[in-house]
C-alpha cells in the first residue's frame, strides 16, 4: 500500500508534497528510462523526417505550394499511369528482386488486378486504351505504327480524352504517344488533349531525346503541344522530366475542377539508361542488362511516389482514381522478366499479354483486395467515361466493359472473353491450314482468343520459352538462361486452360477438339467484324532532315487541281455555249400573253 499523500487525487500540493523517500530511487530509474525512450524515438524517426524533408524540397524546387484539400467536384480526378515494357514479375509484390516500394504500397492499399490483359506491343495497347476497341476494329491489327508510315489512329474514332472533355474535364497527356503523327490532325492535341508534353515515338535516348529509326533517319523527338520542345534539349532524364511536368500541371490546376492525366512513361523501354544513383542497390546483379533495367524501374517507382505526393499536396488525392498498367510484357533480352509466365513482349503467350496492373483510390469500397476477374485494357474507356458521368453514343460499338463495380465492390466481371488479336498479314506458320482448323479457320493466321478459362492460339504465337530472371546469369548481355520447349512439328493450334495452367505448360488441343472448334468459330465471328488492315509503306517525306531535324507531321494534302487538257477545255467550251443558247431560248419563250403582267 502506498504511503499516505502519494496516492489518490488530492488538491494541488506543494512541489514536495509527493516526493516520498521510498520512491526516490525508482523515480530516478524511471527518468533515465524516459530519456532513453526519447533518444530512441528521435533516432527511429530520423529516417522518416529526412524522407519528408526531401519530398518537401522536391516540391519546392518545382515551384509548388501547399493548398487545402477540397473535393467540391462530384466527378473524380482520373490519373492513368502507363509503364512501358514492364514485365509481369518486375514488381515487388510479384516476388521481384527489384525494389518497388511505391508500387507495392499503392497496390496493397488498392486493388491488385491479377487477371489483367493488354496487347503484346506498344501501339495496339495504347490504341485500345484510348478507343475502347480491339485493334481489328481500328485497322491496327498488324505490328506498330512506324515513324516513317503515313498512318495514325483513325480520325473517325472518338477518343477517351474527347469524351471526357464533353463533361467538363481538363485533359493532359505527358509521355509517349506512339499513335501516329504523319498529319497534324493525328497529334495528341487534335485527339482530345488540352496539353501534350512528350515524345511521338517513345523509344529514343532518355537524355538527348533523339531517335533513329534507321541509318540516316534520325531526329529530335520531344514535343510541347504541337511544336518541338527545343528548350528541353538539356540532358534531363525523361522519367524525371515527365514527373516535373505532371507536378507543374497539378500545381496550376484548380482541384475543384475535374482533371484527366494520362502519364505514359518511356521507362522501362530500351535503351537501358538510368541516373547513376539508382544503381546503388543492384551491384549484386551480375547481368548488366538486368542491372540497368532494375535501376530504371527504381527511378520510375520514385517518380510515381512524387506524382502521388503532388496529388495529396494540391488537394486532388481524396477524390482521385489512380490506375497503373504496363503496356505489354517484358523483354528478357533488355532486362525484363515475365517469370513464371511463358513468352515475352511481342508474343501472344501469357508473358507477352498478362500485365502488372492495379487501382488505387480513396473511392474504392473494397481496399486491400485482389481482383481475379477477367479485365482487359479496352475496359478503361467505358469505365472512366462512366465514372466521369459521361455518355457513350449508342451507335458506337465498343469492345470494353464498365468494370468499376468489379474492381471496387468485388462483383463478377461482365467480361467472359478477350480477342487478343487476329493478324491476317502475319501468316508465318508453315504448317497452318484450313484443314488444321477443321475447315473453320486458317490456322496459318496468327490469332489468339480467351473464352472464360480457355485460351486458343493459332499460327505462330511468337517466342515461346520460359525465361527465369537473369539477375545472377553471367552469360553476357546478349545471352540468357531459359527453359526451352520444342514445338511439335506441324503444330499450328494450341489450347490451354489458363485457370488451371497459367504457365501454358500442357497443350490440350488434341484432348478437347470440341472446345477447339468452338473457339475457332468464335474467332471466325470476330473476323467478320474486322476492318481492313492499315499498314502503308514508308514515305520518304517523313525523314526528319526534311523537317528541321524533328520527327513530326510531314504529310500535306494535294490541293492543286490539275489543268484540264486541250480536249477537256474544248468540251467545256462547247457545253457552256449550249447552256447559253438554252438560256436565250428560255428568255425569248417567256413572253406573257392575254394581257397578264409578268411579275
Curated annotation (Swiss-Prot):
Residues at which substrate binds: 176, 269, 345
Subcellular locations according to the entry: Secreted
Residues listed as glycosylation sites in the UniProt record: 157, 306, 318, 431, 497, 527
Family annotation (Gene3D superfamilies): 3.30.1120.10, Alkaline Phosphatase, subunit A
UniProt GO MF annotations: arylsulfatase activity; metal ion binding
Principal location: secreted
Cofactor: Ca(2+)
Main EC class the enzyme belongs to: hydrolase
Key words of the record: Calcium, Glycoprotein, Hydrolase, Metal-binding, Secreted, Signal
Residues carrying 3-oxoalanine (Cys): 122
Top-level taxon in the UniProt lineage: Eukaryota
Binding locations of Ca(2+): 84-85, 122, 327-328
The protein's Enzyme Commission number: 3.1.6.-
Biased composition (Basic residues): 572-584
Bound cofactor: record note: Binds 1 Ca(2+) ion per subunit.
Post-translational modification (record): The conversion to 3-oxoalanine (also known as C-formylglycine, FGly), of a serine or cysteine residue in prokaryotes and of a cysteine residue in eukaryotes, is critical for catalytic activity.
Protein name as catalogued: Arylsulfatase J
Organism: Homo sapiens
